[in-house]
Amino acid sequence: MSRVGKKPVIIPDGVTVTFDGNLCTVKGPKGELSRELHPDIKITVEGNEITFERPSDHKEHRALHGTMRALVNNMVEGVTKGFERALELNGVGYRASKSGNKLVLNVGYSHPVEITPEEGLEIEVPSNTKVVVKGINKERVGALASNIRAVRLPEPYKGKGIRYEGEYVRRKEGKTGK
């Protein structure tokens, strides 16, 4: 039995969850999210709890059980608290700034790199070496943060590049000269 799938999702006050066939819609104070869920997993709403049941112990159903519960839980958490992902810029002259809605990165290329967030996502630049991505959809927040990090991945010799806050980059020893 999936330990994640067994736990019910608690619906906080101010959040409404509706199921229309396979479509799950979650409305809350920060916005609205909807997603298609797998038809095999049985979902029941009792009071302020959502429970998930799988039809059999097949490998596919066991995998889907916890996944569907986690997806709905992330939607509920997103419309109440929201998600954020912080990134740090390490390197001489590496700077981040905002120009209107766009993020402008100066990370050692001959040109500044501009990144435009998609609808529903917000980029903040609290300092010129820190970038914070915020939104209600956990997947999209993580994807945008990953795209920003991919502009200049952290390198193992000097540690220069864009990394997630708190990420450990394994360092390598340089070549020894004669």
UniProtKB/Swiss-Prot annotation:
NCBIfam families: L6_bact (TIGR03654)
Stretches assigned to coiled coil: none
Gene Ontology MF term list: rRNA binding; structural constituent of ribosome
Lineage, top ranks: Bacteria, Bacillati, Bacillota, Bacilli, Bacillales
A GO-annotated cellular component: cytosolic large ribosomal subunit
Quaternary structure (record): Part of the 50S ribosomal subunit.
Similarity section: Belongs to the universal ribosomal protein uL6 family.
Protein name: Large ribosomal subunit protein uL6
GO biological process, any: cytoplasmic translation
PANTHER family: 60S/50S RIBOSOMAL PROTEIN L6/L9 (PTHR11655), LARGE RIBOSOMAL SUBUNIT PROTEIN UL6M (PTHR11655:SF14)
Function summary: This protein binds to the 23S rRNA, and is important in its secondary structure. It is located near the subunit interface in the base of the L7/L12 stalk, and near the tRNA binding site of the peptidyltransferase center.
GN (gene name): rplF
Keywords, sorted A to Z: Ribonucleoprotein, Ribosomal protein, RNA-binding, rRNA-binding
Disulphide-bonded residues: none
